Amino acid sequence: IYDGQKMSIYKERNYDSTKQWKLSDSDLWFKADETAGYNKLEGNPGVYQYDGTKLSYLTFPVKTKLGQENHYSISTNFVRSKNGAVWFGTYGALIGYNGSDFTIINDSYLGLNDETGHLHIRSIMEDSKGNLWIGNNGIGVLKYDGEKVINFTEQQKLKKEDTKGNSLERVFSIGEDRLGNVWFGTVESGVWRYDGNSMKNFTKKDGLESKHIWKIYKSKKGALWFGGASPSGVYQFNGNSFERKY
């Protein structure tokens, strides 16, 4: 960890229980290096927290089942919401902590099963209105307003069975531009833009050559950058179409 003057390397971990979770504005959060890490205790799903003094490994208040060892492995960036809570996206659940309580949105919470499809979270983003967007590889996009969760993909009728073409089912990146439009990067279905009323799909004909959009990054000036693969490329939207920058 670099504090602006020197680099500190932490080889030993402090393993705190879930009862010792705490939250402050200056916390740094890190994904575990492996499912099992350097110590058997790291086999319990959780995250590293640096509080300015020490690095600790904090376990999530969840129970893993045999064969689901990676179910609660971190799969997204961390999101610090406007109300102060921190959100962790794992493959099988969205876990939020507000300093005292946990919110766990998983298959059981949503009533999902083999027939409906399961959570497979690949991206999370909080928009300027405080809505949390959850991108999945399979069941599409979920939207959480702090009280209820809706399947946004189903609401917009953007499942493959509805569109017979490009869908909003495999979403790996989400971003919001300075105008409040929400953008979704997909696998093999280009980029979708939601302006609050309708959806628009951008593909190769719009200058987007990459089939997979893995990352949407927002600069300090509010510009969105889109990182893709197959083929690799970095793009920006000029208001009408995408321009490849790299």
Regions found by a protein language model. Give the residues of each.
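Carboxylate-rich, polar loop motifs that coordinate divalent cations or form catalytic acidic clusters
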Residues: I1-Y246
